[in-house]
């Protein structure tokens, strides 16, 4: 069963009709229901709006919208329930409110130069039966008014811990502070103070500095919804440090020190502040008499073995002192190589031949084979020569034994054959008596 909700004026009329006499009561009720039928109802209509977030000093836009409007009256009220606009009429005398659009389905109003005091709920009302109401919340963002960075000491010494503070004042909501040293993010400790809906944030950073931090920026960067881009401030660190000492040998260029050579060393010292004094000393001994000192340079001419030792360069400034050592060792002078001789050449040639054999194994094998062949041939030749010698000896002995017989045969053909026979007999008798041989061999 549907119920009809009467406006407050209709409810009063109904109460009066109930107190009237019965005949008049019926007439008043009929008149009342007829009047209620002429008032628009909220059936099918929907009033809606959206919240607004705006940065201080900018423009906020408030829109009251109606779906399926039947030309009902729309009005806008401020947080104090004062009417800003009734339809297209502005009862409130605040020129910052301006009508942007008015129709049966929308009432759109702008608020310029928004301040923190404008924050709150704004109400949209639709005059239906029953009336509808919706509200929008305006949130005002306030960026930090001032960003300050404060460093405990303008000039620090390496190894010292310093305090750095960064303050973001009067923001809404509270600001988030981030710390950077160069490109490295660091972690600080923040404290928030609230005053009259505004926030002041102070972040503290404890930083131990080193010589590498000299000239490096310390950056305080804020993050806030009212800030676009990077809002930051920075301070450059100034760090003092003791000297850094390095010894460089400028002569001899090859780096090997020998007797008779010269030595030149240069001491490089870098510090902050710049070292005011650079000195050379010889550790555990006196500096050679022939050594020459000229500022950061040490020059020793005509080196000898007595110059061996450790040479130290010392540098100092107001922060401290440092040193670097150079150990000198003098080598013997280079020996003179004698010119090559015939013997040396022969030895070199022999060595080269051996290396060639070792490098190529096949050449060695062929040489061995050739050596074996020559030995065999030499042996054969020797045997042949020996055989020929033996043959000659045998032939010589043979001819020597048969020499008389040869002459005897030659003599047989002669007239004195008898004498030849006598010679043969004597020859066969041997050679024991040389006189007998002379007697028969005429």
From Swiss-Prot:
It holds the Pfam family C2-set_2. Disulfide bonds join 64-124, 166-220, 267-313. It is found in: Cell membrane; Synapse. The keyword Oxidoreductase does not apply. Glycosylation at Asn-67 and Asn-101 promotes adhesive binding and synapse induction. SUPFAM superfamilies: Immunoglobulin (SSF48726). InterPro entries: CD80_C2-set, Ig-like_dom, Ig-like_dom_sf, Ig-like_fold, Ig_sub, Ig_sub2, Ig_V-set, Neurexin-like. Residues 45-139 form the Ig-like V-type domain. Keywords: Apoptosis, Cell adhesion, Cell membrane, Developmental protein, Differentiation, Disulfide bond, Glycoprotein, Host-virus interaction, Immunity, Immunoglobulin domain, Membrane, Phosphoprotein, Repeat, Signal, Spermatogenesis, Synapse, Transmembrane, Transmembrane helix, Tumor suppressor. It comes from the Eukaryota. Residues 144-238, 243-329 form the Ig-like C2-type domain. One of its GO terms (molecular function) is protein homodimerization activity. It is a single-pass type I membrane protein. One of its GO terms (biological process) is homophilic cell adhesion via plasma membrane adhesion molecules. Glycans are attached at residues 67, 101, 113, 165, 304, 308. CDD domains: IgI_2_Necl-2, IgV_1_Necl-2. Residues 1-44 form the signal peptide. Its main location: membrane. One of its GO terms (cellular component) is plasma membrane. PANTHER family: CELL ADHESION MOLECULE 1, IG-LIKE DOMAIN-CONTAINING PROTEIN. Homodimer (via Ig-like V-type domain). Interacts with FARP1. Interacts (via Ig-like V-type domain) with CRTAM (via Ig-like V-type domain); the interaction competes with CRTAM homodimerization and CADM1 homodimerization. Interacts (via C-terminus) with EPB41L3/DAL1. The interaction with EPB41L3/DAL1 may act to anchor CADM1 to the actin cytoskeleton. Interacts (via C-terminus) with MPP2 (via PDZ domain). Interacts (via C-terminus) with MPP3 (via PDZ domain); this interaction connects CADM1 with DLG1. Interacts (via C-terminus) with PALS2 (via PDZ domain). Mediates homophilic cell-cell adhesion in a Ca(2+)-independent manner. Also mediates heterophilic cell-cell adhesion with CADM3 and NECTIN3 in a Ca(2+)-independent manner. Interaction with CRTAM promotes natural killer (NK) cell cytotoxicity and interferon-gamma (IFN-gamma) secretion by CD8+ cells in vitro as well as NK cell-mediated rejection of tumors expressing CADM1 in vivo. In mast cells, may mediate attachment to and promote communication with nerves. CADM1, together with MITF, is essential for development and survival of mast cells in vivo. This is Cell adhesion molecule 1. The gene is CADM1.
């Amino acid at each position: 069963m549907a119920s009809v909700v009467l406006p407050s004026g209709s409810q009063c009329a109904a109460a009066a009709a109930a107190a009237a006499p019965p005949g008049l009561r019926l007439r008043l009720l009929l008149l009342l229901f007829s009047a209620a039928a002429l008032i628009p109802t909220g059936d099918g209509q929907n009033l809606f709006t959206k919240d607004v977030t705006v940065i201080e000093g900018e423009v906020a836009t408030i829109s009251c919208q109606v779906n399926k409007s039947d030309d009902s009256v729309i009005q806008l009220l401020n947080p104090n329930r004062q009417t800003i606009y009734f339809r297209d009429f502005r009862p409130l005398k605040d020129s910052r409110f301006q009508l942007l659009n008015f129709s049966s389905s929308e009432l759109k109003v702008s608020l310029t130069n928004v301040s923190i005091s404008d924050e709150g709920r704004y109400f949209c009302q639709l005059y239906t039966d029953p009336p509808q109401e919706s509200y929008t919340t305006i949130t005002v963002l306030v960026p930090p008014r001032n960003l300050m960075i404060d460093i405990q000491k303008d000039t620090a010494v390496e190894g010292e811990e310093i305090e750095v503070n960064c303050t973001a004042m009067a923001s809404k909501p509270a600001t988030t502070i981030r710390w950077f040293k160069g490109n490295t993010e660091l972690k600080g400790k923040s404290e928030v103070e609230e005053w009259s809906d505004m926030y002041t944030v102070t972040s503290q950073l404890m930083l131990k500095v080193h010589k590498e931090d000299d000239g490096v920026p310390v950056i305080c960067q804020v993050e806030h919804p009212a800030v676009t881009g990077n809002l930051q401030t920075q301070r450059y660190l100034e760090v003092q440090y003791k000297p850094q000492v390095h010894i460089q040998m400028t002569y001899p260029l090859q780096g090997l020190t020998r007797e008779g050579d010269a030595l030149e060393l240069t001491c490089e010292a870098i510090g902050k502040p710049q070292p005011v004094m650079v000195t050379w000393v010889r550790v555990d001994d006196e500096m050679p008499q022939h050594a020459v000192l000229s500022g950061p340079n040490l020059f020793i001419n005509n080196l000898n073995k007595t110059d061996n030792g450790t040479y130290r360069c010392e540098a100092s400034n107001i922060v401290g002192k440092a040193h670097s050592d150079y150990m000198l060792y003098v080598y013997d002078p280079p020996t003179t190589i004698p010119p090559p001789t015939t013997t040396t050449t022969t030895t070199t040639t022999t060595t080269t031949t051996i290396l060639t054999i070792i490098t190529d194994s096949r050449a060695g094998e062929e040489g061995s084979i050739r050596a074996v062949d020559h030995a065999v041939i030499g042996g054969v030749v020797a045997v042949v020569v020996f055989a020929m010698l033996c043959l000659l000896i045998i032939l010589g002995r043979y001819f020597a034994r048969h020499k008389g017989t040869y002459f005897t045969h030659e003599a047989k053909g002669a007239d004195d054959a008898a004498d030849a026979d006598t010679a043969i007999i004597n020859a066969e008798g041997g050679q024991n008596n040389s006189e007998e041989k002379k007697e028969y061999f005429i």
